[in-house]
Amino acid sequence: MDRITGPFRKSKKSFRKPLPPIQSGDRIDYQNIDLLRRFISQQGKILSRRVTRLTLKQQRLLNLAIKQARILSFLPFTNTESLEKMKARIREARLKAEEVRLKNKEARFKKAKEARNQKKTTFRKIFINPKNSKLNTETNQI
């Protein structure tokens, strides 16, 4: 008895079947660009039946209509607008990464220079002048 009411019991919730992507009034035609654009990916590829939830007959008609629209220049073969946007985003990201890399490099050099300046010590050169036989000293910094 416990197994029936356990966690593996199927729920009896009702669910609503989603509306079909193509209504009965929509006509699949190469001139209906608004309809065709809904079934093309951002890259310009034709979406599969599994994604679009179309029937086999609708998908065949849609493929033919999209191909005709491409040949007649109603639709682009590749969606260049989204490609250009994507390329621009990539370019901006690369520039930003390069700027960050250069800033980090400058910061490392600055830090190293400060460390070198702190490590500088003074030393004395001791030498004997043969003419004076006096002990001369000079202080230098490295």
Curated annotation (Swiss-Prot):
GO cellular component: mitochondrial small ribosomal subunit; plastid
Domain of life: Eukaryota
MF (Gene Ontology): small ribosomal subunit rRNA binding; structural constituent of ribosome
GO biological process terms held by the UniProt record: translation
UniProt keyword list: Plastid, Ribonucleoprotein, Ribosomal protein, RNA-binding, rRNA-binding
Name of one Pfam family that matches: Ribosomal_S18
Predominant localisation class: plastid
Chain segments carrying region Disordered: 1-21
Cellular compartment(s): Plastid
Subunit and interaction comment: Part of the 30S ribosomal subunit.
Similarity comment: Belongs to the bacterial ribosomal protein bS18 family.
Name recorded for this polypeptide: Small ribosomal subunit protein bS18c
Gene from which this protein is expressed: rps18
